[in-house]
Amino acid sequence: MKFSEYWLREWVDPQLSSEALVQQITMAGLEVDAAERVAKPFSGIVVGEVLSVEPHPDADKLRVCKVSDGQEEFQVVCGAPNVAAGMKVPFAKIGAVLSGDFKIKKAKLRGVESQGMLCSEEELTLAEKSDGLMPLAADAPVGVDVRSYLKLDDNIIDVDLTPNRSDCLSILGMAREVAALNKIPFEAPEVKKTAAVIDDVFPVRVEAPEACPRYVGRVIKGVDLSAPTPQWMVEKLRRSGIRSIDAVVDVTNFVMIELGQPMHAFDLNELADGIVVRMPTPGEKLVLLDGQEITINPDTLVIADNEKPLALAGVMGGEHSGVSEKTKDIFLESAFFAPLHLAGKARSYGLHTDSSHRFERGVDYAHQARAIERATELLLEIVGGQPGPVTEICSKEHLPAKALVNLRHARVDELLGVHLDRTRVEEMLARLGLGVHKVAKDGWTFSAPTHRFDISIEVDLIEEVARLYGYNKLPVTEPMAPLGIKPLPESKVSLRRLKLHLVSRGYQEAITYTFVDQKVLSLLTPEEDTITLANPIASDMAAMRTTLWAGLLQTALYNQNRQQNRIRLFESGLRFLKRGGQIQQDPMLAGLIMGASMPEGWESKKRTVDFYDVKGDLESLLEIPGCNLSFRSAQHPALHPGQTAEVLKDGQPIGVLGALHPRIAKTLNLNGPLYLFELCLNSIADGQVPSFKGVSRFPEIRRDLAIVIDEQTPYADVALAIAQSAGEWRVHHELFDVYHGESVGADKKSLAISIVWRHPERTLRDEEITEAFDNVVKELGNRFGASLRS
């Protein structure tokens, strides 16, 4: 929130310098992002009055003006399009020094002498750009220093408030806070009730009291919108980051900054028969003040009349019901909208307004009538008019209940590490408007004021005590606690260990966004119902990833486009799946390889990566947890139908690997074969604890087996059959050759496999090996129709 320091000091003026005030506010938990002078240094600029304007004899776009400083008249050549006789403007006389040490001197412009310069907001450093002279109020005293008249030695303070401190989104809230910090008695300025001059009321009906517990309105007839907004109000709004629009809108914005209550003004003559606060009808549309047409979501509260929607409640008004220069009668709205009903509504339409910012966090539900009286007072002063009586619709059962919070005196001392007597604690909290509801032997029950939505439990009160006491005054003590070192179970496999292993095999870690392109996800996981964002950062970041491949493939494309011919990447992170109406978050580990299998070198042969490279990497990786690992052929929509496998642990699927489907590779502009894997980390987080086995001193016995089987039979099935039939003394078996040719027949292949046996306590007999070998041959024949190769 931005505000003028002078404006704040009109409400409460502590005896502190600007720097000390900013530091105090920050140390109280209201972080000041910036505090800047309203205008950069300049001197010699006074309020001038333009007496006459004549055309320049030799330049169409220049004017020759007579300007008075209250004592003398000066001839000034001016090119501003809005210069006019009778207006009052900042006048830089000869000798004035503008920002940047630019000194005003007597000059001739196209042959006509100019004795000074008429200034715009840009020249006064009040704006980055301006289209013409800065008009001053008609009652501005001629000859007075502009810096003094506009109070340009003021500071703009920008406070970055946390969402729980919505009570400080106003001058009233900041003044309350500063008064409490400096022990200054504070009473908000009284707002007098304006008596009704006319009997006109506008019917109001609230159909959703749970979303709008209080609605206050008032008719004011006969307003004059041609009346200018006073200079003091324009300046206060500008220093709060709000541009002046017209007197009515400026007043509602002013009250919002002053009291924290957003308001809206409707053109009464554009409304049909009454105000209705309701939920929208299906498909209802509204053109907003910014010209954007929207279809109103079913959960969005609207302000309507009896024919059409007028505004998104608490967010933005509609284009056709706002005030204009033709408006003569207005209907003022001041309402309390429940924060939970407004949370996220503005963002769902891609909007963020000052009103929605306040309503989402919570406004004081007791201030709506006060705000409308303050706005009435200002409007009658500026645009005139005849006010009607105030209309108020209130559903007390739906208003927030005042929080009653218990506070133990001993707990205050315990958490803060400093002893504060009971009287001091009571006095501190009283300064913040917290009343003692009940006194007990060990503490109190406090009632929170209506503007503090963030106070609900004991630690909230202790935080307030700490803020007023001063965080910087709290003693610093080292925590004392037994810190026994508890080693992790040996079976636990850390993610860091897995990452380091992949790095040792030439992979590089990538970190990509969780939000990805919906189109990419529809290619990779078309069967999954993706989670989409209502208001994404960008159109290609609108969905939450269902696989880590989405980000890795984009990273691979980025590297490919930069002439990288060997890419090996991995990433760990969450994937997001819809399961039974809930969002399931699974920690995953994924990787990809493409390009050359080895870095280019004089002794390495050039070879492109293949399926067995990524399979070998996975086998090596999964040796860390000691998995009972196996693979089986599978199908995946993102992978090549003939080069896809499931990764199994103890027979249960834990991941998938394979070649990227050529169709997807072409769509994503990825060149050459690319191989991927993805594992569920939870499935490999618990490994097997290694157990010692003595090395047998007896010899190994190896037998080689060459069989002919169908081309389509995967070796993984053959390997499993060998393991199951070779007997208990089998140590291992390896495939060492694959042959295709006329000698084995069409649609056949020959597999050459070595099988090794060894007994831990004796030498195996030849007949035992022969029996085991024959069992293997028999099992392969029965299961796959395999025959020994002749």
From Swiss-Prot:
- Look up keyword Nucleotide-binding and say if it applies: yes
Q: What is its EC number?
A: 6.1.1.20
The record's InterPro entries line, in alphabetical order, gives: aa-tRNA-synth_II/BPL/LPL (IPR045864), B3/B4_tRNA-bd (IPR005146), DNA-bd_dom_put_sf (IPR009061), Fdx_antiC-bd (IPR005121), Fdx_antiC-bd_sf (IPR036690), NA-bd_OB-fold (IPR012340), Phe-tRNA-ligase_IIc_bsu (IPR045060), Phe-tRNA-ligase_IIc_bsu_bact (IPR004532)
User: Where Mg(2+) is bound, by residue?
Assistant: D454, D460, E463, E464
Got a GO cellular component term for this one?
phenylalanine-tRNA ligase complex
Biological processes annotated in GO:
phenylalanyl-tRNA aminoacylation
Catalysed reaction(s) here are: tRNA(Phe) + L-phenylalanine + ATP = L-phenylalanyl-tRNA(Phe) + AMP + diphosphate + H(+)
Domain (B5): residue spans on this chain: 400-476
tRNA-binding domain location is 39-147
**Compartment annotation:** Cytoplasm
Domain of life of the native organism: Bacteria
Predominant localisation class: cytoplasm
- MF-aspect GO terms: ATP binding; magnesium ion binding; phenylalanine-tRNA ligase activity; tRNA binding
- Obligatory cofactor(s): Mg(2+)
UniProt keyword Transcription present: no
Keyword line: Aminoacyl-tRNA synthetase, ATP-binding, Cytoplasm, Ligase, Magnesium, Metal-binding, Nucleotide-binding, Protein biosynthesis, RNA-binding, tRNA-binding
Domain FDX-ACB, residue spans? 696-789
NCBIfam families with a match to the protein in the record? pheT_bact, YtpR
Quote the HAMAP family the UniProt record gives: Phe_tRNA_synth_beta1
Describe its assembly.
Tetramer of two alpha and two beta subunits.
Q: Which family does it belong to?
A: Belongs to the phenylalanyl-tRNA synthetase beta subunit family. Type 1 subfamily.
Give the PANTHER family listed for this entry. PHENYLALANINE--TRNA LIGASE BETA SUBUNIT, PHENYLALANYL-TRNA SYNTHETASE BETA CHAIN AND LEUCINE-RICH REPEAT-CONTAINING PROTEIN 47
Q: What's the name of the protein?
A: Phenylalanine--tRNA ligase beta subunit
In which organism is this protein found? Answer: Hahella chejuensis (strain KCTC 2396)
